[in-house]
Amino acid sequence: MGPLTFMDVAIEFSVEEWQCLDTAQQNLYRNVMLENYRNLVFLGIAVSKPDLITCLEQGKEPWNMERHEMVAKPPGMCCYFAQDLRPEQSIKASLQRIILRKYEKCGHHNLQLKKGYKSVDEYKVHKGSYNGFNQCLTTTQSKIFQCDKYVKDFHKFSNSNRHKTEKNPFKCKECGKSFCVLSHLTQHKRIHTTVNSYKLEECGKAFNVSSTLSQHKRIHTGQKHYKCEECGIAFNKSSHLNTHKIIHTGEKSYKREECGKAFNISSHLTTHKIIHTGENAYKCKECGKAFNQSSTLTRHKIIHAGEKPYICEHCGRAFNQSSNLTKHKRIHTGDKPYKCEECGKAFNVSSTLTQHKRIHTGEKPYKCEECGKAFNVSSTLTQHKRIHTGEKPYKCEECGKAFNTSSHLTTHKRIHTGEKPYKCEECGKAFNQFSQLTTHKIIHTGEKPYKCKECGKAFKRSSNLTEHRIIHTGEKPYKCEECGKAFNLSSHLTTHKKIHTGEKPYKCKECGKAFNQSSTLARHKIIHAGEKPYKCEECGKAFYQYSNLTQHKIIHTGEKPYKCEECGKAFNWSSTLTKHKVIHTGEKPYKCKECGKAFNQCSNLTTHKKIHAVEKSDK
């Protein structure tokens, strides 16, 4: 045999043979051939670049018509190669076995190293006269093109070659990082040079590795070769399928010794470790914000670019991340692949399932350093922190009002637009908040799930129960800075403050009358509509307001739940009790601006004002 050339370690395929290989096998073939060529260049053997290497570097198919005519197809070659390139085995080793079949004429016995001989050189000294494969390869070349089926051990070389066989002999001059394979160093160098030689004409995006371009192409084609046998979900990368399979097995093989937490993906463990170290190594040049993951920084950069390349085919909505598009599509398909083993509830996003599981475990891993309050969702902690900082980053462009959560701003905007997306199927009434619809539905069902442990009284809303409990405690934590008056509810204090400011932001479009509460405006509108939706089952009398119906019912029951602690007198309305208490305190909060006379009840002041009105008319 003559000196070793690239064609001695290369495999060529016909069109039919190439089509028998799947994408993973084709990509691996490219990488192995390029690596073998680079190794020959490194050893000073390859002089001119073969056509095959030029094709592979340009991302073209590794055959042409001229080469196809030269290669005769052996019987059964298609199966032969596909079998040798099984993904579940070492495909690289399989390719190297195919390479070595070219040297079968030398005889297998010439390739075998006897037990006890640690290098080709030692065996050559002992045997002396073999003319086969060992004559084709130098010691260093044997190391690079070894086949583990025939070679026992090539780890020890002569002193002259030892410097080439270190653990990571290929070192980057730019940053000092070492690699065990020359092709890995070549790929790494592109990070420093930012050469993206593999460009997709469809979207203009460029990559520094051909295999990354191949993967990216699948985004445009929608091609998903890798399907889960368990649930049928398909993926465009085999690594994504392997990661997905762990969901079904429940395996968590990556454990953090420091806190005992386990993960099913090694990258998740790496990310988790940063929580303990607090490291944020990836910084945005645009705004200076730092992240603990490079992928998070990449996603963040899209915010500055404003780019939304991932478009939904169903509704046209665009997203800046492919994962967000995947999640969004499940709205259209109704697909909920993530199921809770505890209660059977299913979700369309894995993160929602993770959050849901904490309901069963009671886990609250996100703790506020300011007050110690813990939460089961990180976003809730972020919102909570704004209570301490007073930050309100979400501002309404219409009126300038600011909010500490985006959801509150979204709800607020509906005041300006008049949008009411949540409709009651029972009566057709619409609401601008989902919580309002939920509360409204209880009117139809009559359900009162919230019960007071103190007195047994039941309520339709949890907020009403919270308000009611304060009656038993007598607590009034909300105090007016203007006049010192205290209230048991923050909403009552907010309403009260408008007395001092005179603010009436809620205006009726029908008659122009303004109110200081949205609920008062809502009740007022019923007057124009003539609607009386709240009907007494006892006598059939109808009312504009639910509170009026509640007060009316007391006539039938004779119930007087509001008792004066001073004298024991009981009343059927809380407002009547409030008026009564003034008798004991001597307080006269209602003052006439005309003459300065004060009264303990608003109605008495109203009556008094008429005296001045009559006096003015007489003049």
From Swiss-Prot:
The protein's role, per its UniProt record: May be involved in transcriptional regulation.
PROSITE patterns in the record: KRAB (PS50805), ZINC_FINGER_C2H2_1 (PS00028), ZINC_FINGER_C2H2_2 (PS50157)
BP terms from Gene Ontology: regulation of DNA-templated transcription
GO terms for cellular component: nucleus
A GO term for molecular function: RNA polymerase II cis-regulatory region sequence-specific DNA binding
Stated name of the protein: Zinc finger protein 724
Annotated compartments: Nucleus
Organism taxonomic ancestry: Eukaryota, Metazoa, Chordata, Craniata, Vertebrata
Originating species: Homo sapiens (Human)
SUPFAM superfamilies: beta-beta-alpha zinc fingers, KRAB domain (Kruppel-associated box)
Record key words, sorted: DNA-binding, Metal-binding, Nucleus, Repeat, Transcription, Transcription regulation, Zinc, Zinc-finger
Zinc finger (C2H2-type): 170-192, 198-220, 226-248, 254-276, 282-304, 310-332, 338-360, 366-388, 394-416, 422-444, 450-472, 478-500, 506-528, 534-556, 562-584, 590-612
The keyword Cell membrane is assigned to this record: no
Classification via CDD domains: KRAB_A-box
Similarity-based family: Belongs to the krueppel C2H2-type zinc-finger protein family.
Record-annotated KRAB domain positions: 4-75
